Curated annotation (Swiss-Prot):
Protein name: Phenylalanine--tRNA ligase beta subunit
Leading EC class: ligase
Domain FDX-ACB: 701-794
Matching PROSITE patterns: B5, FDX_ACB, TRBD
Catalytic activity: tRNA(Phe) + L-phenylalanine + ATP = L-phenylalanyl-tRNA(Phe) + AMP + diphosphate + H(+)
Gene (name only): pheT
CDD domains for this protein: PheRS_beta_core, tRNA_bind_bactPheRS
Record-listed E.C. numbers: 6.1.1.20
Species, as recorded: Idiomarina loihiensis (strain ATCC BAA-735 / DSM 15497 / L2-TR)
Record's subcellular location: Cytoplasm
Cofactor: Mg(2+)
Residues that bind Mg(2+): D454, D460, E463, E464
Length: 795
């Protein structure tokens, strides 16, 4: 929000300097980004009147003038501006003047004609960059008066960076309220009178989309003359607020926007066909905007329409076909309240950003529409003439925002701020803020005005009290708190321990957004409905994640584009699964997820160069499961997952309960997800890896272990894990290790079969095993494999 300091001081004028005012606003939460003079330094520039003007005898593009500057004799000046003519009031730099850029005005001759000064343009005085001829001043500008004094150029433009919740301060009125509160001053509202209708013309208004637009006011104004210039006092206030003067109608609506904070729009009445309807866009409906851009409107876009066509994108941008031009004689003026949800994100969707959408997205005062209408009408009639009809209003009270009172507890206020503020002071602060206040000795009941739509809970009021009381007035004090030793169960693993275990294997911890791109998430989880945010940060972050994979995939894709060859990330966090049976309709599950892509390890002379594969990631997961002290309880079972490669994916089970997934991302997603190398992922429920049994000390056997190798031929599609699980379930207590060390398919093995070689390590804790006992145990294993898998010993 950029504005003129002098304009603000017309509303409230504290006895403090510009610097002190800026500091005061910043400390109250309205951060001042910049304070700049509205004009560069120059002097000896006065108001003049061209009393003679004729062509230069020796130059086609020059004119010879005599200018009255309030002295005994007029000044001879040669001018090259096309708009120089007899009778206009101008800005004259007299001999001796110094203009911006240290440009000094001296007596001179141009093509033989004396020139004792210069008729100035806005650019030459450093006011605006555009060079559109010399400055033309109003006819009542006093000849001879210093130009800086006449335009009050000893002023500053203040630029405030407002947080999104303070939409009420996107106006002079709103900032003046704040300054008045901070300085205990009343705000002087400029005098404005309600305009009495002088004609009976009206347009009826219907609200087909009442929820999106619960209040709409319109007024017909006829016989306006839009060729009249906008008064210099208004154009200067607009310029100092960063807005260029265009024409009287646009200037007035912009002025009201800055003064009151309420956007308005004007239509050419003669271009309208029938009455006004505020509705949602029809399928495939198109609108040519004021910038001549043709857009196809989405069906959730709110539009202002007549009986035949859409006229404007409500709260965002006007349409060209109904726009006001210099030749317009009759206009229809709009003042409406659009719900923030109806406008939010619409401008960005169509590649637009306007002052109107900026305010409507943050919220405007739902009670301000008539005030804005009367103010704009008054200004338009004063500048352009014409006659105004009565104000027509359509309102759906049920959809207008309702403000509930807020309770502020004295004990809560003191606890949060850490300082005790006298109850009378708190009451005074709340009343100065314009709130309705009652206090019963323990708590305040506070009624919130319609323009403070950012206040809804007790903490909001605590913040208001703190910033008006003054953060600097709150004395620093060391925090006082009781420190207690916390009990940490040895049977409970922390997420830090799990992440550290993965970091030790070369992973880096990542933190990604819980909001993800719905298109990318739908690719991987097309059968899982996701929660859609009503007010997303952006369209690309509008869905809650149903897995941590989308965020991790985005991190890998980002790094692959930056030539990173070894990528491994681990993350813990929540995934959000829609579930009507869960609290608030969403099931939040804590998980630990990982992703690997690129090379298996960094380049090193002692290591071969190979890409990461499924078994690298499976080994990482097994190391993670080993942290539980019960890795044997988990097993990997080949399964299908729509996000994963059908031949390189598995579900992770603990007993009969599925607790996670692992596999290679399906190659068909690589291009859409921005991946250029094979990528492997895993995800586990955090609850199953944070629990572990307490360690039990067992004596180490003093007797030797015995190894036997067992090679069996089984079906080619049989997973080795199933064989190992079957052997472990035989119940041989002497079995201490079982390991697959060879897989063979080829000569000597029948078609459709594979040879699996396992090492079996046996050891008894009480004695040395004899050969007969070992043979008996191995026979049990072989018989089990034969009966369950039709396995045969390999020759």
């Amino acid at each position: 929000m950029k504005f003129s300091e002098q304009w603000l001081r017309e509303w409230v004028n504290p006895d403090i300097s510009s610097h002190e005012l800026s500091e005061q606003l910043s400390m109250a939460g309205l951060e001042v980004d910049a304070v700049e003079p509205v004009a560069d330094e120059f002097h000896t520039v006065v108001v003049g009147e061209v009393i003679e003007c004729g062509p230069h005898p020796d130059a086609d593009k020059l004119q010879v003038t005599k200018v009255n500057v309030g002295e005994d004799e007029p000044v001879d000046i040669v001018c090259g501006a096309s708009n120089c003519r007899l009778g206009i009031k101008v800005a004259v730099a007299k001999v001796g003047a110094v203009l911006p850029g240290d440009f000094k005005i001296k007596k001179a001759k141009l093509r033989g004609q004396p020139s004792n000064g210069m008729l100035c343009s806005f650019k030459e005085l450093g006011l605006i960059d555009e060079h559109d001829g010399i400055i033309e001043l109003p006819a009542d500008a006093p000849v001879g008066e210093d130009y800086r004094k006449y335009l009050q150029l000893d002023d500053n433009s203040i630029d405030i960076d407002l947080t999104p919740n303070r939409g009420d301060c996107l106006s002079i009125r709103g900032i003046a309220r704040e300054v008045g509160v901070l300085n205990r001053l009343d705000v002087t509202v400029p005098e404005s009178n309600e305009v009495t209708a002088s004609i009976e013309d009206t347009l009826s208004i219907s609200l087909s989309a009442a929820e999106q637009c619960p209040r709409y006011l319109g007024r017909v104004i006829k016989g306006v003359d839009l060729t009249r210039p906008t008064p210099v006092w208004m154009t200067e206030k607009l310029r100092r607020s960063g807005i260029r003067s265009i024409d009287p109608v646009v200037d007035v609506t912009n002025y009201v926007l800055l003064e009151l904070g309420h956007p308005m729009h004007a239509f050419d009445l003669d271009s309208l066909e029938g009455n006004i309807d505020v509705r949602l866009a029809k399928p495939k409906e198109q609108l040519t905007l004021l910038d001549e851009q043709l857009v196809e409107l989405d069906e959730d876009t709110l539009v202002i329409a007549d009986e035949k066509k859409a006229l404007a994108m409500a709260g965002v941008y006007g349409g060209k076909n109904s726009g006001v031009t210099e030749s317009s004689k009759n206009i229809f003026l709009e003042s409406a309240f659009f719900a923030p949800d109806a406008i939010l994100g619409k401008a960005r969707r169509y590649g637009l950003h306007t002052d109107a959408s900026h305010r409507y997205e943050r919220g405007v005062d739902p009670q301000l529409q008539r005030t804005a209408m009367e103010r704009a009408t008054e200004l338009l009639l004063a500048i352009c003439g014409g006659e105004a009809g009565p104000v027509t209003e359509a309102v759906a009270e049920a959809f207008l925002p309702k403000r509930d009172g807020i309770t502020l507890r004295a004990c809560r206020l003191a606890k949060v701020l850490g300082v005790s503020i006298a109850n009378d002071n708190v009451t005074e602060i709340l009343e100065r803020l314009g709130f309705d206040v009652s206090f019963d000795g323990e708590q305040w009941q506070v009624g919130i005005p319609s323009y403070r739509f950012d206040l809804s809970i007790e903490e909001d009021l605590i913040e208001e009290v703190a910033r008006v009381y003054g953060y600097n007035s709150i004395q620093a004090a060391p925090p006082a708190a009781q420190l207690r030793m916390t009990e940490r169960k040895e049977s409970q693993l922390s997420t830090h321990q799990l992440v550290d275990a993965m970091v030790s294997r070369g992973y880096q911890e990542a933190i990604t957004y819980s909001f993800v791109d719905p298109k990318h998430q739908a690719l991987m989880f097309d059968e899982t409905a996701a929660l859609t945010l009503p007010h997303p940060i952006s369209v690309d972050m509008s869905s809650m994640r149903v897995s941590l994979w989308p965020g991790l995939v985005g991190a890998v894709a980002h790094n692959q584009k930056r030539q990173q060859s070894v990528l491994a990330f681990v993350e813990t966090g929540l995934r959000f699964i829609p579930d009507e049976s869960a609290e608030n309709g969403v099931r939040q599950e804590a998980v630990i997820s990982g992703i690997r892509s690129g090379k298996a390890h960094s380049e090193h002379w002692s290591e071969g160069d190979r890409p990461v594969d499924f078994y690298d990631v499976k080994g990482d997961v097994e190391a993670l499961l080993a942290q539980t002290g019960n890795a044997a309880a988990f097993r990997f079972v080949a399964s299908q997952n729509p996000a994963l490669h059908p031949g390189q994916s598995a579900a992770i089970y603990r007993g009969s309960e599925k607790v996670g997934d692992i596999g290679a991302l399906h190659p068909k997603f690589d291009k859409a997800l921005g991946l250029n190398q094979r990528t492997f992922v895993f995800e586990l429920a955090l609850s199953v890896v944070t629990e572990r049994p307490l360690p039990q000390a067992k004596p180490v056997s003093r007797y030797p272990s015995i190894r036997r190798d067992l090679a069996v031929v089984v079906d080619k599609d049989l997973a080795a894990g199933e064989l190992i699980a079957a052997m472990e379930n035989v119940g041989v207590k002497q079995l201490v290790d079982l390991n697959l060390f060879d897989v063979y398919i080829g000569d000597g093995v029948a078609e459709g079969k594979q040879s699996l070689a396992l090492s079996v390590t046996l050891q008894d804790s009480d004695k040395t095993l004899e050969e007969a006992e070992v043979t008996e145990l191995m026979t049990k294993f072989i018989e089990t494999l034969k009966s369950e898998f039709n396995a045969t010993l390999r020759d």
